[in-house]
Amino acid sequence: RVLFRSVLSMVADGGGYGVPVNFVWDGARSVYIHCAPAGRKLTAIEQNPRVSLCVIGNVHLLPRIFTTEYESAIFFGEAHIHLSDEEKMRALHLLIDKLSADFKELGDKYAHMSFHRVEIIRVDFTEFSGKRKKVK
């Protein structure tokens, strides 16, 4: 199973602010990110919902030839918070399917039990760019 590294970036306190996140794609044009129900990330999104998500795939350092193989993509869009309870629970189930697929029943119980301690961010993307370097 591949777990991509990702960083959600936004503007906070007049400057750039990036945090590592777990995300799940909804199969269309949005991703969901889970977080605590309060904090700097949510405050920043309330002030300016325009964000980017940088996703880093496979990275291989090739020291013998002084280069690195990599793949990455950056997505730009608008973040939405204060989603309906139904959408939040659907997002939590998508995250469980992605991150804990072998524990769906337990994940469902946990999602219901901790629902009040979780916020969900939906990011709707408007554009993206990707880059890859593969050495032959």
Where in this protein do the model-derived segments appear?
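A broad, low-specificity signal marking well-ordered, structured residues that form hydrophobic/aromatic
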Residues: S6, V21, V31, V51, ...
